[in-house]
Amino acid sequence: SGSCSLKTCWLQLADFRKVGDHLKEKYDSAAAMRINRKGKLELVNSRFNTPTVEDLVYTDQSPDYCLRNESTGSMGTLGRLCNKTSEGMDGCELMCCGRGYDQFKTVQVERCHCKF
């Protein structure tokens, strides 16, 4: 005749797109660091704020993904197809790294499997 209550708590991941956008934002604002003579990390540019525990930091520059680099496994972007009208990652301006690009049109003929 006694009563009891039950509470359940759980954690749930945010939407995958939101997680990706958040990580990209952190990546884009990561702080460049170097190791000083005492073996401690310090900012490369002291004009920026000291990073918090929530910020990303790096000591090495990212490779140039526009160029082929066998040591990193990057194939570069030379010869890849791009979308002239896109402003995203697949857009020609970004993907071609300012080198310019060739334009061409293709006609694609496919069977439509239509039924009448």
Curated annotation (Swiss-Prot):
UniProt GO molecular function: cytokine activity; frizzled binding
Post-translational modifications: Palmitoleoylation is required for efficient binding to frizzled receptors. Depalmitoleoylation leads to Wnt signaling pathway inhibition.
Main location class: secreted
GO cellular component, as recorded: extracellular space
Lipidated sites in chain (O-palmitoleoyl serine): S1
Keywords from the named record: Developmental protein, Disulfide bond, Extracellular matrix, Glycoprotein, Lipoprotein, Secreted, Wnt signaling pathway
Gene Ontology biological process terms in this record: canonical Wnt signaling pathway; cell fate commitment; muscle cell differentiation; neuron differentiation; positive regulation of convergent extension involved in gastrulation; positive regulation of non-canonical Wnt signaling pathway
Glycosylation sites: N69, N83
Regions annotated as coiled coil: none
InterPro entries referenced in this protein's UniProt entry, alphabetically: Wnt, Wnt_C
Disulfide-linked positions: C82-C97
Record's subcellular location: Secreted, Extracellular space, Extracellular matrix
Family: Belongs to the Wnt family.
Function in brief: Ligand for members of the frizzled family of seven transmembrane receptors. Probable developmental protein. May be a signaling molecule which affects the development of discrete regions of tissues. Is likely to signal over only few cell diameters.
Name of this chain's protein: Protein Wnt-5b
Organism: Plethodon jordani (Red-cheeked salamander)
